[in-house]
């Protein structure tokens, strides 16, 4: 009888141990949980690393990390950002992503992008937190040209941003609302501010602000 009881106790302990082991998550399991689903090659960010990107060496930038399927741009003394290092089109493309402001009072998404052989930047939440527009058009910033508009942005809320670039038009949407509708006039010159030259050809920055980015995609337009 005693041997039988000992055997039963041993069997119970063995079953309990197996259950506990099955509930322990390995580092691979945790990594898989944080990865966003990569449905196709249009995704520029894999959710777990900066593969294809580099931290932009602005100098006084804040820390940059990948956590929970997001690129986190820490608050720096100026620009903090990442630059895409793989091939990028010059025209007829669409970039979409989700961005949120975590802390700070300035832009949480400064997207520098090519327009043919020129470059420009879409600023979301600049100049104190509410300005949206293109920098620069004929040397005028997003706060002072024909694309200037204003929006209130909540901390901790994700905003879906879409940018469509063609030869003579640049359009931007935030949560499906058209916020930039630029049509190039004869003689217009597009350029970028000196602070973000290192973001070329395509990069995303924040300015004195902690920001998070996810679901970054690139699609060709017909």
Predicted region positions:
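Carbohydrate-interacting regions of secretory-pathway proteins
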Residues: 18-222
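Bacterial N-terminal signal peptides
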Residues: 7-14
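Positively charged n-region of N-terminal signal peptides that target proteins for export
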Residues: 1-4
């Amino acid at each position: 009888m005693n041997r039988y009881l000992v055997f039963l106790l041993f069997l119970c302990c063995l079953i309990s141990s197996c259950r506990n082991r099955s509930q322990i998550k390995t580092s691979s399991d945790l990594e898989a949980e944080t990865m966003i689903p990569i449905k196709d090659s249009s995704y520029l960010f894999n959710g777990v690393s900066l593969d294809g990107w580099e931290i932009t060496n602005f100098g006084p930038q804040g820390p940059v990390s990948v956590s929970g399927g997001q690129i986190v741009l820490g608050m720096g003394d100026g620009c903090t950002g990442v630059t895409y290092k793989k091939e990028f089109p010059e025209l007829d493309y669409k970039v979409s992503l989700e961005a949120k402001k975590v802390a700070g009072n300035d832009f949480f998404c400064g997207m520098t992008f090519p327009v043919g052989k020129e470059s420009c930047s879409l600023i979301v939440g600049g100049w104190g937190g509410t300005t949206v527009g293109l920098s620069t058009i004929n040397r005028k910033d997003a706060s002072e040209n024909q694309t200037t508009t204003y929006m209130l942005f909540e901390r901790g809320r994700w905003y879906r941003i879409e940018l469509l670039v063609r030869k003579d038009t640049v359009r931007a949407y935030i949560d499906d609302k058209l916020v930039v509708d630029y049509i190039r006039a004869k003689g217009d010159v597009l350029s970028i501010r000196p602070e973000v030259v290192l973001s070329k050809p395509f990069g995303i920055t924040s300015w004195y602000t902690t920001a998070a980015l996810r679901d970054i995609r690139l699609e060709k337009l017909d």
